[in-house]
Amino acid sequence: VSGALLEAQAVSWRVGPALILDRVDLAVARGEMVGVIGPNGAGKTTLLRLLSGLLPPSAGRICLDGHDISGMDSRARARQLAFMSQDASPSFPFTVMEVLLMGRYPHLGRFEREGPADRERALRTLSYVGLTGIEERQFSELSGGERQLVLFAKTLVQDCDALVLDEPSSSLDIRHQDRIFSMAQELVREGRAVVASVHSLSVAAQYCSRLVLLDRGRVAADGRPEEVLRSAVIDDVYGVKTLVSPNSATGTLTVTVLPRRASGAGMRVHLIGGAGSAVNLSRELYRLGYALSGGIAHEYDSDEKLWKSLGIAHESVGAFSRVTDEDVERATRLVATADVTILCSFPIGPGNIGNLRLAGKSRKLIVLRPGPEDVPRSFFSSEGKAIFDELRAGAQLMSYTEVCAELDRLSDGAGSGSLPAG
């Protein structure tokens, strides 16, 4: 790729008969922070070691600033590219300062020793990563997180245009994790290139401008976080059910692994919500394995967004649209096949009064009693209040906890017949 600072061209890596990487293409430009993600054994560390010139590819080639890396000596390569290993265990009894000064080795002459300027650079960098005053301590005496920060500081002391970081935050708390990735972003803004393998998909989405997803040695997806982190792709590669949603504080994507679902005994439950009132109950009943349906929801409502992300069958209308008689008829098929319909707590006005009429078509109706943190049930017309009172007279009023217990009882076959009125 034209303009790439670091590039893998159809790179493969084989150990005996095992093909660890299979024809991987990757081009990283200046000003780009690329996160390499994937399950354990996908080939992330192998790819990073190939990019760094620490392993020779079985096929293909690695180019650094347009030059085949295999033709560069280690000192010349290290002047342009710094590698941080995820292994922070000490091999020799070095002080922190001695570890940092190893980053200056590529910039020294054959018989040249580090000078005051090199030591000053090391001290400034140590302060930059938040570890002032530990330069004379033994590297082996540091905690795992401190060692990782020192090794990251060493890559900064090396002063390269390309940085390759293998799980740089695996031993760090969230404060120091943010420090490392924020510093990496600063390097990118200066025109450098950063490639990092990242275990957490949410962290990768927050800090990286681009993600490369590896699966069994091949590139499964490559693009912006919102292009790569799609539930259908992640579920297939990782073998789990996930929910990908925007973080309301950062605007970046958060990936959550959904709990493994119980059987739910095949019971079908329809949820009628609004204003996000069905979100918590939907999540819990989904986890318990009930066959859920929902609606009628308004587009962009939290209920509708959750049902869509979980693949729950539901009916919806446009945002701010009135629920019409035709909408109610369309949704009746879901209510008619449900063993139980649950009417959640939400404000009822002209736009959604049709949901009360839909509840009246249920075989068995539970009216959810609002809790202290739930949306209050309020009415903006006497008609809505009258319809609700009629529904309430023939239904069971239950709390969140009581609903879960009642569904469990019914799914065990103890609740044949109609629900008692309350």
Predicted feature residues:
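The feature captures the beta-strand-to-loop junction immediately N-terminal to the Walker
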Residues: 37-39
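Helix-to-loop junction immediately C-terminal to a conserved catalytic motif
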Residues: 52
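Conserved ABC transporter NBD signature motif
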Residues: 60-68
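Conserved ABC ATPase "signature" region
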Residues: 101, 116-134, 159
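Catalytic Walker B motif of ABC-type/P-loop ATPase nucleotide-binding domains
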Residues: 163-167
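Conserved ABC ATPase "signature" C-loop
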Residues: 216-217, 223
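ABC ATPase nucleotide-binding domains
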Residues: 239-312, 317-323, 343, 392-422
